[in-house]
C-alpha cells in the first residue's frame, strides 16, 4: 500500500517515522558520482502558532552534505521537521531535486539520485546553479553554517574559472 506513495527511485523500510534518507548519487549510466558533488538539504519546520484560517507557515533551515566514498550519502531527518528537500549538485550535471514528507510508518528512505548530464554546463551554472547557491550565502534565514557557506563560495569560484 505504501509503495504507491513514492517514485520508483525511492525505496523504504518501515518504522515509526522517517529518520534517515540514504542513497547514492549516480550519473545517467548508473555510475557513482563523487569528487565535487554535494547535496543541499532544506528542512522545513512548522511555525508554532497557526490560526485556523491560515495556511501553515514553514521555516526552512539549510545544510550541506558531502558525499561519502562511492557517491553514497546519509541524511539525518530532524524529528522536528515536517518535510525535507534535497538538491543534488555536481559539475557538468543538471540539478536534481527531491522532496520528502515525514510519514508515519516509514522509518528510512533510500533514494538513488540519477543525475542527467548538462550539455551546456556554463549556461546552467550561470542561470540556475549560481543563483540557487548564492541565495544560501546571502540569506540569513537559512542559517547555513559559515563553513558550508565558505565551501559553496569556493566551489562556485572554481566552477566559474
Language model segments and positions:
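Short, acidic Ser/Thr/Gly-rich low-complexity loop/linker segments typical of extracellular
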Residues: 47-74
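Short, ordered, surface-exposed loop/turn motifs in non-cytosolic proteins
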Residues: 28-55
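Short proline/glycine- and polar residue-rich coil/turn motifs
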Residues: 66-69, 103-107
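Short Pro-Gly-centered beta-turn/loop motif in secreted/extracellular proteins
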Residues: 31, 74-84
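A short, solvent-exposed loop/turn motif at the edges and junctions
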Residues: 82-106
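Compositionally biased low-complexity segments at domain edges in trafficked proteins
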Residues: 109-161
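Beta-strand-rich domain onsets/edges
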Residues: 5-20, 24-31, 37-39, 140, ...
Amino acid at each position: 500500500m505504501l509503495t504507491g506513495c513514492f517514485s520508483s527511485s525511492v525505496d523504504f523500510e518501515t518504522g515509526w517515522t522517517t529518520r534517515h534518507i540514504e542513497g547514492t548519487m549516480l550519473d545517467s549510466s548508473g555510475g557513482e558520482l563523487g569528487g565535487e558533488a554535494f547535496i543541499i538539504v532544506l528542512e522545513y519546520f512548522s511555525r508554532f502558532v497557526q490560526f485556523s484560517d491560515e495556511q501553515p507557515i514553514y521555516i526552512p533551515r539549510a545544510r550541506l552534505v558531502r558525499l561519502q566514498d562511492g557517491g553514497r550519502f546519509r541524511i539525518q531527518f530532524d524529528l522536528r521537521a515536517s518535510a525535507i528537500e534535497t538538491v543534488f549538485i555536481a559539475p557538468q550535471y543538471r540539478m536534481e531535486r527531491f522532496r520528502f514528507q515525514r510519514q508515519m510508518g516509514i522509518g528510512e528512505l533510500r533514494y538513488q539520485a540519477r543525475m542527467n548530464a548538462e550539455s551546456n554546463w556554463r549556461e546552467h551554472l550561470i542561470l540556475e546553479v549560481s543563483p540557487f547557491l548564492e541565495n544560501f550565502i546571502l540569506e540569513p534565514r537559512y542559517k547555513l553554517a559559515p563553513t558550508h557557506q565558505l565551501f559553496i563560495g569556493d566551489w562556485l569560484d572554481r566552477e566559474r574559472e
